[in-house]
């Protein structure tokens, strides 16, 4: 089975895009590990190891997608490093801050 360059790039981008749905620490870890893995695959000369790396990455994408859905089911507070988002929760926090300053 030959893997096209387009498939590899799409897989890489999908993993990075899906990783952004995680909280800060998991997101940064997953992005860093993904970049490192694909840098290794870029210089891999053995086709069998390359294809196995792609299969592992496809499994990783499935795991990340499943886990991001599970994480999204639970209401969580953002870490300080993430800042306030533009969701309804962020708007409520901003309105309370403005009211307390008045």
Curated annotation (Swiss-Prot):
Family matches, as InterPro entries: Complex1_LYR_dom, Complex1_LYR_LYRM4, ISC_assembly_LYR
Record's subcellular location: Mitochondrion
Pfam family, one: Complex1_LYR
GO cellular component: cytosol; L-cysteine desulfurase complex; mitochondrial [2Fe-2S] assembly complex; mitochondrial matrix; mitochondrion; nucleus
Keywords for this protein: Mitochondrion
GO BP: [2Fe-2S] cluster assembly; iron-sulfur cluster assembly
Function: Required for mitochondrial iron-sulfur (Fe-S) protein biosynthesis.
UniProt similarity note: Belongs to the complex I LYR family.
Protein name: Protein isd11
């Amino acid at each position: 089975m030959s893997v096209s360059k387009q498939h590899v790039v799409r897989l890489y981008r999908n993993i990075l895009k899906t990783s952004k749905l995680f909280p800060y620490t998991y997101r940064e870890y997953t992005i860093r590990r993904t970049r490192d893995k694909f840098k290794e695959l870029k210089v891999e000369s053995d086709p069998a190891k390359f294809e196995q790396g792609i299969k592992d990455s496809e499994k990783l994408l499935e795991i990340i997608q499943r886990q991001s859905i599970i994480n999204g089911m639970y209401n969580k507070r953002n870490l300080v490093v993430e800042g306030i988002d533009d969701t309804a929760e962020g708007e409520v926090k901003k309105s309370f801050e403005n009211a307390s300053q008045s």
